[in-house]
Swiss-Prot record:
ATP binds at I64, G65, S66, G67, F68, F69, S70, E71, V72, K87. The modification Phosphoserine is found at S219, S369, S456, S460. GO terms for molecular function: ATP binding; metal ion binding; protein kinase activity; protein serine kinase activity; protein serine/threonine kinase activity; protein serine/threonine/tyrosine kinase activity; protein tyrosine kinase activity. The gene is TESK2. It comes from Homo sapiens. Its cofactor is Mg(2+); Mn(2+). One of its GO terms (biological process) is focal adhesion assembly. Residues 58-313 form the Protein kinase domain. This is Dual specificity testis-specific protein kinase 2. Belongs to the protein kinase superfamily. TKL Ser/Thr protein kinase family.
Length: 571
């Protein structure tokens, strides 16, 4: 079979082998009908993504995971040996979302956004090739027995916030932000997080323009309350999902309400959750509570989240360095007194550290920094107008609001919808990354762009949010030395400058393009996922006082070991 036919799919153009074929040149009879043709922008966007088209049999595949709509393989190119990840769509009704995801990823370039590598066609379907992330996802990392100090946890939270801030600045929000879609990369500098899975991403609606209400999509455990109630929502829904992820990071528990306490109105049970935080930095816990606020207007933006986490991370690193300086003389004295201490043999390293049925380890012990210095008390306030603490003497069992609604099926489903024309239009309007951002591999054939012979009328400016990301393009390091600064020029993000305390950049106008696309009929499908049981974490003794309606918010005081409820109101 001819290769051009083998690499084509219904509704999509075959791979262009020569520039003359795209432009209608070459002098062949088959190109006569193409002379002078004005190609629509949707076709040109696909050509850009298809410039790195490959076949499945060009790779060796190893399955490493699966989701509701796709299976993920670790693939190695037979010729070059390059390792990538292949996301194979398994649901025919999800083809439109897969196509949109490919087009969107092809126009995003940021160290905390999963990097697009190319596309693969197999059995008439389009599949995305991305960079391979070597340490799984955030949910798997938190479920492991690895000890994660607070500096590492805050750094991972910072990476996710920076990636989402970049996405929001581009005028798009994720709508399916979960700990499963945050991938973990490990290198010589430690752990870093990368945001993935943009199949449900949508253009941020403009309330002033009377935008159409968006459909209910996402994973229920992480969905914002306004989304679950089928109310109008915007990018602040991503902030609530991020808050649930922060709860997972702090307590190292699953987002399942059987482990993470929730309220009947799909909010976070702050009073119950504070028993599970151990020696969490109070300002980190305060940020988590702010993100989980039931009122979308009271949730911070990812710009504010990133700045707060940057301050927290800097303080934790200073405390860690101070603790190391105090530990060095003590460790030296112990070695002088006990020179005969012998290290365990290498055979002990081979003993498995986990039982056949692993159970989640929740790190609730005091940090070593508490041994040397007593931290001053700090307060954590709950400013959620829809939250009422329960009376400690009449506590009710844990609430699972997802079991009360039949349509949510216990929360173990995933809602999806066809992409709207607005997000497709925005995808085509986004500037593609520069050629230096994603170098082609040896097996990838570069495709020269066609000569522009047409001009569209000027369009209205793109609806980018003005709260730009001053820290986008930076990547913190867990090493002892100063973190490297990655400027926006390196990642070809023209709209976002590197971190400065200057004013925010204004949105840039983009050229209007034809946004027509064929849409298939959508079906509703779900694939329940099994959940592994984990023990509830040890909680600390607390006294909880109920606040009457209309009173000031409850205030929780912390002094380095657990949290205690103050008997007086703020102010």
């Amino acid at each position: 079979m001819d290769r051009s036919k083998r690499n084509s799919i219904a509704g999509f153009p075959p791979r262009v082998e020569r520039l003359e074929e795209f432009e209608g040149g070459g002098g062949g009879e088959g190109n006569v009908s193409q002379v002078g043709r004005v190609w629509p922008s949707s076709y040109r966007a696909l050509i850009s993504a298809f410039s790195r088209l490959t076949r499945l049999d060009d790779f060796t595949c190893e399955k490493i995971g699966s989701g509701f709509f796709s299976e993920v393989f670790k693939v190695r190119h037979r010729a070059s040996g390059q390792v990538m990840a292949l996301k194979m769509n398994t649901l025919s009704s999800n083809r439109a979302n897969m196509l949109k995801e490919v087009q969107l990823m092809n126009r995003l370039s940021h160290p905390n956004i999963l990097r697009f590598m190319g596309v693969c066609v197999h059995q008439g379907q389009l599949h995305a090739l991305t960079e391979y992330i070597n340490s799984g996802n955030l949910e798997q990392l938190l479920d492991s027995n690895l000890h994660l100090p607070w500096t590492v946890r805050v750094k991972l939270a910072y990476d996710i916030a920076v990636g989402l801030s970049y996405l929001h600045f581009k005028g798009i929000f994720h709508r399916d932000l979960t700990s499963k879609n945050c991938l973990i990369k490990r290198d010589e500098n430690g752990y870093s997080a990368v945001v993935a899975d943009f199949g449900l991403a949508e253009k941020i609606p403009d309330v002033s323009m009377g935008s159409e209400k968006l459909a209910v999509v996402g994973s229920p455990f992480w969905m914002a309350p306004e989304v679950l109630r089928d109310e109008p929502y915007n990018e602040k829904a991503d902030v609530f999902s991020y808050g649930i992820i922060l709860c997972e990071i702090i307590a190292r528990i699953q987002a399942d309400p059987d482990y993470l306490p929730r309220t009947e109105n799909f909010g976070l049970d702050y009073d119950a959750f504070q028993h599970m935080v151990g020696d969490c930095p109070p300002d980190f816990l305060q940020l988590t509570f702010n993100c989980c606020n039931m009122d979308p207007k009271l949730r911070p933006s990812f710009v504010e989240i990133g700045k707060t986490l940057e301050e927290i991370l800097s303080r934790l690193q200073e405390e860690e360095q101070e603790r190391d300086r105090k530990l060095q003389p003590t460790a030296r004295g112990l070695l002088e007194k006990a020179p005969g201490v012998k290290r365990l043999s290498s055979l002990d390293d081979k003993i498995p550290h986990k039982s056949p049925c692993p159970r989640r380890t929740i790190w609730l012990s005091r940090s070593q920094s508490d041994i040397f210095s007593r931290k001053p008390p700090r307060t954590v306030s709950v400013l959620d107008p829809y939250y009422r603490p329960r009376d400690g003497a009449a506590r009710t069992p844990k609430v699972n609001p997802f079991s009360a609604r039949q349509d949510l099926m216990g929360g173990k489903i995933k809602f999806f919808d066809l992409p709207s024309k607005s997000v497709i239009s925005l995808v085509f309007d986004l500037d593609a990354p520069g050629p230096g951002t994603m170098p082609l591999a040896d097996w990838q054939e570069p495709l020269a762009p066609p000569i522009r012979r047409w001009r569209s009328l000027p369009g209205s400016p793109e609806f980018l949010h003005q709260e730009a990301c001053p820290f986008v393009g930076r990547e913190e390091s867990l090493s002892d030395g100063p973190p490297p600064r990655l400027s926006s020029l390196k990642y070809r993000v023209k709209e976002i400058p590197p971190f400065r305390a200057s004013a925010l950049p204004a949105a840039q106008a983009h050229e209007a393009m034809d946004c027509s696309i064929l849409q298939e009929e959508n079906g509703f499908g779900s694939r329940p996922q099994g959940t592994s049981p984990c023990p509830a974490g040890a909680s600390e003794e607390m006294e909880v006082e109920e606040r009457p309606a209309g009173s000031t918010p409850a205030t929780f005081s912390t002094s380095g070991i657990g949290l205690q409820t103050q008997g007086k109101q703020d102010g």
